[in-house]
Amino acid sequence: MKSTKSLKMEYKKIHLDLLKISKKNNHSSFLNFLKSSPPKQLKEFNGELSVYLSKTIVGQQLSTKAAKTIWERAEKFIIDHPLQNRNLENDLRESGLSQKKCEYVKNILISNTLQKKKNYYKTIGAEEFTNLLISYKGIGPWTVDMAKMFFLGDINILPKGDLGIKKACNNFFPNEDLDSIEEIYKPFNSYLSLNLWDSLD
């Protein structure tokens, strides 16, 4: 495991790499944004994959504020021995989740395959991880990308289906498509994504 100091140096170095890449490719608007912004950190979720996926599903198609409110209500039912909670679906419904989201979350929480230690998912390979996740209802490409970034800590993810990413890329790189941008900023696309999201705030 990397020390706090080495992690701090790593994200600062990546910020410098982004500056170099944007300058080399004449992305002046993005370069100016990077110069005026602090280095972004990619923070891994500290918990089980099933809990991370549940939290992500709770927040789907909701504003950040609404997602936070509902998660704060539902979290205790999801984390505190969900397998022993016979009233889990009812508890989730009362927390504000739709019927479909309740079903999705319950199926994720009762899956033994999603209860393994994080290192297991880091070693099975990206394709197998993707196939595992999308086999569950309620999980699509966007959720897989979020899990790769914020659960596994993959530094090279550009979630091309994300509306915010599309909007920010159109602002900074109006003459280039997402595939081209992804290739240009490889292998630091997750840090590119963090900056793109931040530019919309």
Give the positions of each predicted feature.
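Active-site phosphate/pyrophosphate- and oxyanion-stabilizing loops and adjacent acidic/basic residues
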Residues: 56, 131, 167, 179-180
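Short, charged amphipathic recognition helices of the HTH superfamily
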Residues: 124-127, 175-177
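Hydrophobic/aromatic-lined pockets within catalytic cores
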Residues: 62, 152, 173
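Intrinsically disordered, low-complexity basic tails/linkers immediately adjacent to helix-turn-helix/homeobox/MYB/SANT
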Residues: 168-176
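Catalytic DNA-binding helix-loop module of base-excision-repair DNA glycosylases/AP lyases
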Residues: 125-169, 191
